[in-house]
Amino acid sequence: MKVLFAASESHPFVKTGGLADVIGTLPRYLKKIGVDVRVVIPKYSAIKSHLASEFNFIKYFYVPVGWRNKYCGIFQCEYMGVIYYLIDNEYYFFRDELYGYYDDGERFAFFDRAVLDMLWQINYKPDIIHCNDWHTGMIPVLYKIQYKQSSFYRGVKFVFSIHNLLFQGNFDKNILGELFNLDGSLYENGSVELNGAVSFMKSGINYSDKISTVSRSYAFEIQSPEYGENLDGLLRSRSSDLWGIVNGIDYDIYNPEKDNMIFRNYNKNNLRNKMINKLKIQNDLNLDINENVPVLAIISRFTPQKGMDIIKTIGERLVSKHVQLIVLGTGYNEYEEYFRYLSSKYPRNVSTNIYFDDVLAHKIYAASDMFLMPSLFEPCGLGQLIALRYGTIPIVRETGGLKDTIIPYNKYTGEGNGFSFANFDGDDLLRIINDAVDYFEEKDIWNNIVTHAMESNNSWDNSAKPYKSLYESLL
């Protein structure tokens, strides 16, 4: 079985969010269970230079973008057993950022056609092309209308994964003719039209053979008007083809027993070493050094989706108590300024770090007692999975993948690996934090919760198997 992943980013080459983590990890775990996987992404100037130098130039050709023919170079390397391709065009991809440009529609129109043209150019025919998010949504459209009849391309199947339905790639309807050489009937019949625009996301959903998303609960949620972003009706109509598969994390990268980024390695049988991480980070971040004070962590993009609005409503009530808060991330200016304000007013209780640093993130995961993730919605979420791995107890809102992966602590049975609340409300969040702090003060109970958290299995080994089953259902 041959599967080609097409995506807009992949760790470790280039990353802006969780999509890159999935594309950088899942293929390796699929390979371990017998799937021949390859990956293709754009050749951005932002790709780390020491990794970019590992790629070898294969060939070049020209890709039609409307009436123009655009240069396309193909580079290849093998990384951790998986073959990666880079699609090169300096005009489209040598820019300061990956996304957010006026011509993003044209950039990914080029990429989507280049992926299909590349297959013939390098004589590689996958059984399945696995597309990811809106950036690759036009690949199955182009295939079924312009490529399917060719003997070389015949028989290829498509999986389209929704990592976040909010971002839909909606562009002016004129791009169908101007960039894809497609007639307006696709827009008029509604198969690619959404809210008066051509939607790459809707196109991918409509023209793929199977659809997946990154947790079971999110698969149900996006079929409702509340979460469906005006695509709930389409998703309900395709519910029999919609799979919800929870993301995993790479247990080799996130391993408190071997992690060389943290102060002291530990496991569930040696939690005293976790405490050493806590005392060290309190010292480094100029917080009061006290092992009995619960340390709460936020490692996140600062956006409304991540629950920042309800955190703002309780921030001062929270940190004026006997707790500490460590914040790491960037995002909307109003949230950055709020966290700066908290740390200036409560400098011994709050450490605000308005940037992202992977080493510091690992240290915070290892050192903290609790991890806040009160998302408005969350397709899957990786932060809570990493926190579990490090015995840092997640406090989450019951939505999407958070609901699937965090089992609320039950004081009667002793079961559970975290704490959760249902309503998107600051008072409810504060109440559940207070409950967690109460249990934190009862060390035997708390250590039991930590042990359960560290025993949770969220490795990609678990998630790769249902993906293989999904592929097999198409063959």
UniProtKB/Swiss-Prot annotation:
<dbReference type="GO" id="GO:0005978">
    <property type="term" value="P:glycogen biosynthetic process"/>
</dbReference>
<dbReference type="Pfam" id="PF08323">
    <property type="entry name" value="Glyco_transf_5"/>
</dbReference>
<dbReference type="InterPro" id="IPR013534">
    <property type="entry name" value="Starch_synth_cat_dom"/>
</dbReference>
<dbReference type="GO" id="GO:0004373">
    <property type="term" value="F:alpha-1,4-glucan glucosyltransferase (UDP-glucose donor) activity"/>
</dbReference>
<dbReference type="GO" id="GO:0009011">
    <property type="term" value="F:alpha-1,4-glucan glucosyltransferase (ADP-glucose donor) activity"/>
</dbReference>
<protein>
    <recommendedName>
        <fullName>Glycogen synthase</fullName>
        <ecNumber>2.4.1.21</ecNumber>
    </recommendedName>
</protein>
<keyword id="KW-0320">Glycogen biosynthesis</keyword>
<comment type="function">
    <text>Synthesizes alpha-1,4-glucan chains using ADP-glucose.</text>
</comment>
<keyword id="KW-0328">Glycosyltransferase</keyword>
<comment type="pathway">
    <text>Glycan biosynthesis; glycogen biosynthesis.</text>
</comment>
<dbReference type="InterPro" id="IPR011835">
    <property type="entry name" value="GS/SS"/>
</dbReference>
<dbReference type="InterPro" id="IPR001296">
    <property type="entry name" value="Glyco_trans_1"/>
</dbReference>
<keyword id="KW-0808">Transferase</keyword>
<dbReference type="Pfam" id="PF00534">
    <property type="entry name" value="Glycos_transf_1"/>
</dbReference>
<comment type="similarity">
    <text>Belongs to the glycosyltransferase 1 family. Bacterial/plant glycogen synthase subfamily.</text>
</comment>
<feature type="binding site">
    <location>
        <position position="15"/>
    </location>
    <ligand>
        <name>ADP-alpha-D-glucose</name>
    </ligand>
</feature>
